[in-house]
């Protein structure tokens, strides 16, 4: 409810719309203003004391550094688990998007790496990319970049294309941590080990706040969730999946015992793999000791993603999970923005906003498309903007002649567990 107050970016608005939006945003922000100054270990404790006198209740929020970080997530708790992944897991979202893009006769190119944004007279005109060792060039009137912003500004563009002042601010921006993510396959349902649908936060309350977020596997907080409990398509019958998540940083143990080659590639040798295993063992042992006795005896196999892994697959600086943090420093430095110094080059991923996660990524993609539609298809722009502002119902958008029709032909692919179940069925069953 009321998410439309903050969903549409001011960069897509006219002067008078921005003026009205400032009042709407002020109305949204006023309840939070009294709590802005409560941050740090002492400030957080003082702020929480205004809500809870019982120290035990205050300790429930030890994983945050700002009082706003405790208050705002409560507002994200939708009835009916609105933010839970769809049936089949989070991979269903990109699978569906790829289907829709292909449905409209557009091409999706995978395993590609953009090398350079082509510019002519201050305007982007295309890009070059590498696909399995072969160089390709694409001409384009607009480019929406959903990649790491520093990589875009410092490696894909000429040095003079982006002001040094902006690049300096981005280098100094406060970013979210990366993580250690351990995905466990179990020989039993997670319910058998005592897990339910809630996300469990495991933290040692005797440790100071800095130790709880340091990235040291012995002291850092751990989040635990059982995906297969909510979604039975993710594991074979009688088995289960468990995900362990711990904040982590690229600078841990000499950058995870990796080395950089001349081309900027991070080399992962035996020392890296040993450290990765050691950290995973510590985390699993802590969960076993405090939450699920005998956990290790039920593990069929598991996979571990480190900050290096997240960096390799996303390109995000230091493997950060969600880009730039919401906060006073990043807001004052205007870290979030859609329109870049290069005309028609638009940011469309979580780097366009402060914060991250699926809602922010969806917001960024929608606003990036609005900026283009505003110039290229006014009818579509007005309809979509009206929907994002909460003025037009979805049914009206779907009937609008400005948009091509879609037949809802997508069918969710079977998960590996579902494929295994089908393979075990008797012939003709």
Identify the residue ranges that each predicted region occupies.
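Active-site/ligand-binding neighborhood in enzyme catalytic cores
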Residues: 3-104, 111, 309-326
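A glycine-rich dinucleotide-binding beta-alpha-beta segment and adjacent secondary-structure elements
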Residues: 53-68, 223-225, 284-354
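Beta-rich nucleic-acid/ligand-interaction surfaces
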Residues: 108, 112-129, 301-316, 387
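A conserved FAD-binding loop/helix module that cradles the flavin
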Residues: 350-373
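Mid-domain catalytic core of redox enzymes
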Residues: 85-86, 115-236, 389
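Active-site-proximal substrate-binding core of FAD-dependent oxidoreductases
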Residues: 113, 119, 373-416
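Extended, polar/charged low-complexity intrinsically disordered and coiled-coil segments in eukaryotic
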Residues: 244, 428-429
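C-terminal segments that line or cap access tunnels to active or ligand-binding sites in enzymes
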Residues: 187-305
């Amino acid at each position: 409810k009321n998410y439309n107050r903050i969903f549409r970016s001011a960069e897509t608005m006219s002067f008078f719309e921005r003026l009205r939006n400032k009042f709407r945003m002020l109305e949204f922000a006023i309840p939070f203003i009294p709590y802005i100054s409560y941050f740090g270990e002492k400030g957080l404790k003082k702020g929480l004391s205004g809500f809870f006198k019982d120290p035990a209740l205050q300790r429930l929020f030890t994983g945050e550094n700002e009082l706003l970080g405790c208050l705002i997530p409560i507002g994200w708790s939708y009835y009916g688990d609105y933010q839970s992944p769809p049936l089949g897991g989070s991979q269903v979202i990109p699978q569906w998007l790829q289907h829709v893009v292909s449905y409209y006769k557009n091409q999706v190119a995978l395993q590609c790496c953009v090398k350079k944004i082509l510019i002519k007279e201050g305007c982007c005109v295309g890009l070059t990319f590498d696909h399995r060792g072969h160089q390709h060039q694409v001409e384009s009137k607009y480019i929406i970049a959903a990649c790491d912003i520093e990589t875009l500004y410092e490696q894909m563009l000429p040095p003079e294309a982006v002001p040094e002042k902006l690049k300096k601010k981005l280098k100094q921006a406060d970013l979210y941590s990366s993580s250690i993510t351990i995905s466990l396959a179990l020989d039993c349902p997670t319910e058998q080990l005592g897990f339910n649908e809630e996300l469990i936060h495991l933290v040692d309350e005797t440790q100071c706040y800095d130790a709880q977020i340091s990235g040291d596997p012995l002291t850092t907080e751990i989040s635990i969730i059982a995906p297969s409990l909510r979604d039975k398509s993710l594991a074979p019958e009688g088995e289960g999946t468990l995900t362990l998540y711990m904040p982590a940083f690229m600078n841990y143990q000499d950058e995870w015992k990796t080395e950089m080659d001349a081309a900027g590639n991070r080399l992962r040798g035996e020392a890296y793999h040993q450290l990765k295993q050691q950290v995973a063992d510590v985390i699993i042992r802590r969960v076993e000791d405090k939450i699920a006795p005998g956990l290790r005896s039920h593990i069929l196999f598991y996979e571990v993603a480190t900050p290096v892994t997240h960096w390799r697959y996303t390109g995000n600086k230091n493997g950060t999970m969600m880009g730039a943090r919401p906060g006073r420093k990043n807001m004052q430095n205007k870290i979030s923005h859609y329109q870049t110094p290069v005309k028609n080059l638009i940011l469309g991923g979580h780097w366009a906003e402060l914060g991250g996660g699926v809602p922010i990524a969806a917001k960024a993609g929608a606003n990036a498309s609005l900026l283009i539609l505003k110039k290229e298809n006014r009818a579509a722009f007005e309809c979509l903007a009206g929907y994002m502002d909460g003025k037009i119902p979805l049914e009206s958008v779907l009937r609008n002649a400005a948009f091509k029709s879609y037949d809802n032909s997508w069918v969710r692919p079977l998960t590996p567990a579902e494929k295994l179940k089908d393979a075990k069925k008797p012939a003709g069953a």
